[in-house]
Amino acid sequence: MALKLTSPPSVFSQSRRLSSSSLIPIRSKSTFTGFRSRTGVYLSKTTALQSSTKLSVAAESPAATIATDDWGKVSAVLFDMDGVLCNSEDLSRRAAVDVFTEMGVEVTVDDFVPFMGTGEAKFLGGVASVKEVKGFDPDAAKERFFEIYLDKYAKPESGIGFPGALELVTECKNKGLKVAVASSADRIKVDANLKAAGLSLTMFDAIVSADAFENLKPAPDIFLAAAKILGVPTSECVVIEDALAGVQAAQAANMRCIAVKTTLSEAILKDAGPSMIRDDIGNISINDILTGGSDSTRNSTAMLEENTVSDKTSANGFQGSRRDILRYGSLGIALSCVYFAATNWKAMQYASPKALWNALVGAKSPSFTQNQGEGRVQQFVDYIADLESKQTATTVPEFPSKLDWLNTAPLQFRRDLKGKVVILDFWTYCCINCMHVLPDLEFLEKKYKDMPFTVVGVHSAKFDNEKDLDAIRNAVLRYDISHPVVNDGDMYMWRELGINSWPTFAVVSPNGKVIAQIAGEGHRKDLDDVVAAALTYYGGKNVLDSTPLPTRLEKDNDPRLATSPLKFPGKLAIDTLNNRLFISDSNHNRIIVTDLEGNFIVQIGSSGEEGFQDGSFEDAAFNRPQGLAYNAKKNLLYVADTENHALREIDFVNERVQTLAGNGTKGSDYQGGRKGTKQLLNSPWDVCFEPVNEKVYIAMAGQHQIWEYSVLDGITRVFSGNGYERNLNGSTPQTTSFAQPSGISLGPDLKEAYIADSESSSIRALDLQTGGSRLLAGGDPYFSENLFKFGDNDGVGAEVLLQHPLGVLCANDGQIYLTDSYNHKIKKLDPVTKRVVTLAGTGKAGFKDGKVKGAQLSEPAGLAITENGRLFVADTNNSLIRYIDLNKGEDSEILTLELKGVQPPTPKAKSLKRLRKRASADTKIVKVDSVTSREGDLNLKISLPDGYHFSKEARSKFVVDVEPENAVAIDPTEGTLSPEGSTMLHFIQSSTSASVGKISCKVYYCKEDEVCLYQSVQFEVPFKVESELSASPTITFTVTPRAPDAGGLQLQGTR
């Protein structure tokens, strides 16, 4: 997770700031202030005019200059409603207060002022966001708002019209001007207000309300639509407004604007730059509208002349004087900062004065670039000596006594850590960059094992779920962390030391002073040299203490993991036609294959130990594999071997594993394009296979991109994402940014892939033609660098709140299922309506089978679904596979899949072969007549029905086992069947006792021009010597193809 202390976006600079965790620049999205989007985010005029709306409208190009002595032709007047025609702004705020009072939330009418003129949804939702109202339902709140407002405040003929409103509208019509109401309110409120004000709807040539628009004021869409309906050019329209959003919308639409002071002061309005300002609508004359008036409230001729002389064009196309740019820019900065602070409060809570100072001038540390030679350690020794002599180093605060510890008893600097060199690792377990540095810390711990040195992990949570001690304990177990870890959930140590990014290391001296502070990954050498220098310097001062710390490793206190068949399983895949479930048994470093009822079939990677090795199923090794994708055509399984930074391929025909990309080293290439293992990868977390073009799409969590591997040419390259860790939806790969994508699934039409963008807590759709993306649910749709918009709220689109989703799956019917991992829930997303609903889970981590609403999971991750609607879930922290029958609707239950025959891995030699001798659940057992001759040739002939042939690519094979092992010598013991499906085995019985030979065959065959199929058959041949004569018995068998729903195994296409 490339996260730093978040700051409001600049509207001027195109600054690039360095991400401390990924060491790639994070660009601050910067556009000149023109108007705001629906939620108040300031965007450029160009951007806004290109944004999609439900009603298609277009603006005229603004004139290059405005004549200073001519107001210009006026053909239409567009009246805002609230605050202009109707004295309803205060009434609206009072109705909104009533809504929140009913919810038990204390608010005041002033809380709603910043959101006036932006539409009811934002009007209510903005305050709900600021007040941190959990479970806020904007649709329900909006409905209740209208009920209260219409019933209590806006009764017909209640006299809410401003004095002079009726007269001015009438006078405009008498002058031949067209008049329209153009309001950000919904039509129901517009009609009610006009009636309450005594203004007949028939007075107006058009009434344009919020219902038909995606973008409300300050976007120009409503005004542009009104002009289009009236048939009047935008340059001939005059707008009357009371809100900043309205003034800005008028400017964006190239319309003159008269502002009234019914809501805001003249000073605030003047900064927005309206054409003129009046107290209220009763003070606007027809002369003001037709000629622009003549008093000081209109922009003066001198100022207009100054603007004409000093016209400058900004990089974003804004034309105006330097004064205009400064004026509008200052207003934009102010309002952007207010909105940013309100919507990014979770990010802002990590700030501290010291963090801001460190972000500006840098924390105290030696230079790591000046000397890379042999004298580097001595350079750091000299630096430490200078630091101690000046006594300028920061003292590390003591750990608060209330903090919980893992892997150790509570530690204190003045007691346990005194006399030791300490690295404080500020981390949060969701962060991919924090995972990347764990091998560096392990290296240091091993190198300085017998010395007065230790690492202390200071867990400083980003997500709410990460503050839970049990969740952190599971992370410690999952990543095999053996050093002490403290749960600093309230960020005390973080703030005191001014930390502003994950991960950050503080190297602390034996006397509790900060020697160096280093942010980001890739600093093994720097940390190693600083620690070596510290041990050298303080060793010479005789202040080191080698007393061991009181360790108590969590892995030694959790017996369940020692006997569990699975250990933190990550992802799933299904071979529906072959009745197989693939499980990435991540912390056992293997892939498990069962049938759909949980019966063991085979394992790939037998030792359970971390490794990186190709070869047979027994010899192959993985390192915490995650994503899986099945290629039915070739009977291959693609594996995202995450901590080997590799893409692996499991070949079930030849029972081999090979590496397709990556070589075990973490890469930093953001473009790719190399072939095979020459192309390095960076923490691939999930994969999906696109069969038409034969591409494997990779969710590259480590560098926030989507990559593709071509099966046809073996080249791996970036597909989408510029590598910046952001939540940015663009139209091209270069303008799109992801934030630790951790799940990927193809849509049924293969036109889009769906992404679980975990760090932005959003679900996004990736266009497989253009490489661009769009938001479906969750995340912050406006501030791309705000990765702190998370929670637990069902709803539609951006109102949805998720918490670090890790898995996504699109079913054949187009419905999307997702694991809302840190909310411990399974949810469903309709990609058309963008509505998200909870299917299962309570929101609290736990384990409980039963009805979906009451059942509990613990950080679920991977998903897979069968054709008959059984949804499998990798329940990661429970180390279980769960499933839901989706056909039962509200009566659905979460049940636990019983894994029969799946054992924890064992490092014993040939353990895999022993397991494979057992017939799998899909094997047909054929018992044949006894063989009574001492010696002979056993002929095996397998035939197929008409219309089928043996596969030429996937050769059928056999393997022979005998019980007892040495009772019969059979040669060969394994091999392939002939193209006609036959083989001959020579046998010699060495014992007169009865024995059994088992000939296990894997038969691959195809129907002409259709799918290819697979059948597992085991022939049990009894042996007993009754004759010394030689014989050549024959075993015949005809394969009977089985339908998919009967469990028959099918392979798409190998012919």
Swiss-Prot record:
Stretches that traverse the bilayer: 328-345
Gene Ontology cellular-component terms listed: chloroplast; chloroplast stroma; chloroplast thylakoid; chloroplast thylakoid membrane; nucleus; thylakoid membrane
Cofactor(s), names only, from the UniProt record: Mg(2+)
Enzyme Commission designation: 3.1.3.-
NHL repeats: 565-597, 611-647, 673-712, 802-832, 854-887
Organelle targeting sequence: 1-56
Active-site feature positions: D80 (nucleophile), D82 (proton donor)
Protein family: In the N-terminal section; belongs to the HAD-like hydrolase superfamily. In the C-terminal section; belongs to the thioredoxin family.
Protein name per the record: Protein SUPPRESSOR OF QUENCHING 1, chloroplastic
Organism: Arabidopsis thaliana
Gene from which the chain derives: SOQ1
